[in-house]
From Swiss-Prot:
Cofactor binding mode and count: Binds 2 Mg(2+) ion per subunit.
Key word Oxidoreductase present: no
GO biological process: DNA recombination; DNA repair
Species of provenance: Solidesulfovibrio magneticus (strain ATCC 700980 / DSM 13731 / RS-1) (Desulfovibrio magneticus)
UniProt name for this protein: Crossover junction endodeoxyribonuclease RuvC
Compartments, as annotated in UniProt: Cytoplasm
Domain of life: Bacteria
Catalytic activity: Endonucleolytic cleavage at a junction such as a reciprocal single-stranded crossover between two homologous DNA duplexes (Holliday junction)
UniProt keywords, alphabetically: Cytoplasm, DNA damage, DNA recombination, DNA repair, DNA-binding, Endonuclease, Hydrolase, Magnesium, Metal-binding, Nuclease
Gene behind the chain: ruvC
């Protein structure tokens, strides 16, 4: 099992072709970027192999960074049933790796994540990317999937802060 003493949050943006990840920690009230990137599965010959790559990559991230919790965006419901099913299976592969590691997973609606970072649930991806860079004080530009994963992690840290401020559990 991974070391979970550092307060790192693993944000995930699962997809069947590209799964974004972002690791963020809070130190003395300041959010810090730990790592971010994208797991690409397009080189795999079939869909089950892609799911295996996602599971293994997330398990390796957990082992390497020892996050305390996981934050993931809720599945966007597509009009295309086959696409929605594949997205759900990719999400399941990522979350199974989290479950095996004993991590608690927190899911947020896309509008909640956008509201948490930008102040409106209807924000554009470019606005979210801008705020992720500002909040984490990083100049690096990330792929959209990694930015979405970082946004999920920051959202969860913001929600934890609000919970502490309100005195709720």
């Amino acid at each position: 099992m991974a070391n979970t003493g550092d307060g790192i949050i693993l944000g995930l943006d699962p997809g069947s072709r590209a799964t974004g990840y972002g690791l963020v920690r809070e130190r003395s009230g300041v959010l810090e970027l730990v790592d971010a990137g994208v797991v690409r599965t397009t080189s795999q010959p079939d869909f089950p192999s892609r799911l295996g790559v996602i599971f293994t990559a997330v398990a390796e991230l957990i082992q390497r960074h020892g996050p305390a919790e996981v934050s993931v965006e809720n599945v966007f419901v597509s009009k295309n049933a086959a696409t929605a099913l594949k997205l759900g299976q990719a999400r399941g592969a990522a979350l199974a790796a989290c479950a095996v590691a004993g991590l608690s997973v927190h899911s947020y609606e896309p509008t909640v994540i956008k509201q948490s970072l930008v102040g409106t649930g209807r924000a554009e991806k470019s606005q979210v990317a801008f705020m992720v860079a500002r909040v984490l004080a990083c100049r690096e530009t990330f792929a959209v999937d990694a930015t979405d994963a970082l946004a999920a992690a920051v959202c969860h840290l913001n929600q934890r802060r609000l919970t502490r401020l309100c005195g709720a559990r």
